[in-house]
């Protein structure tokens, strides 16, 4: 093996170990004293070259605490990063209503991303006729429930297709704050581990509407503190002593009825929704998202989120939606989606709970 190969392997090893965080080093370990972000940056550049794109990749890897196990993986991830960067730049030159940008998913292929981040069950058993009761009232031009203080902080689902659990807890946390005047964090992990009998599949997908039915039948949902998130399928550990919220019933929006969804978001509270994520969406950065590539049927939707408001940007009406990919993604963990066309099926599988 050449000396250069040995150096590159050492660089890769230092890179992976250092990004694991200081807790992985003993204080007496001399490596901890010399490995800093600028040194890691230089180490990556030794592997992938000295181009501007290589520098972007090095800084991306450091910012997002990436862990690569070998020189070969660094090279592979750099190539994927370049492909995504090319797509980002090509899109942003078109002057469309939304921008793409580098985020923690830029070193992932679409197949890798889809495996770990999408999880709303297809064929969501949407309600042909919902049970929301409408009245003759003029809806406000804009709404943002964050301003009312009932929307809980953005969470991150990790490498688990549990988006449906975060949509569920987001709706419940908002309903709880609205009803009782204080915040609460509820257990996604209980839904992952315990709600399988209600046509949910843990890290392999599920639906908020079915989760509401499970919680109603089960008698409640534990708090996050009592039943913390692991991001893996596990054995059910529900404890009645740790219940944070109970569900009395839920309200379903008629399939594809955006006015009903708008009515509920405007006058009731945040609503769990699902839509189809297609390839470019993972790099969303800002603006009003729209796509001609996504579908809008119950068989198309693959990601559950939480509609927390709506508005108008540059003349385009939009939904304001809370995601579960962390606060560094999109607009502080949120995105805007074009309203009025049932874009990507946003009003296809919508529901919200009534809590006690």
UniProtKB/Swiss-Prot annotation:
Tell me one GO biological process term: positive regulation of apoptotic signaling pathway
Kind of enzyme, top EC level? Answer: hydrolase
This enzyme's EC code(s): 3.4.22.-
Instruction: Please provide one cellular component term from the Gene Ontology annotations of this protein.
Output: lysosome
Q: Where is the signal peptide?
A: 1-16
On whether Signal is a keyword of this UniProt record, the answer is yes
Q: Which domain of life is it from?
A: Eukaryota
Q: Determine if Disulfide bond is one of this entry's keywords.
A: yes
User: Where does the entry say this protein is expressed, by tissue?
Assistant: Predominantly expressed in stem and root.
Q: Which residues are the propeptide, according to the record?
A: 17-138
Identify its protein family. Answer: Belongs to the peptidase C1 family.
Task: Quote the protein name from its UniProt record.
Answer: Cysteine proteinase 3
Q: Which organism is it from?
A: Solanum lycopersicum (Tomato)
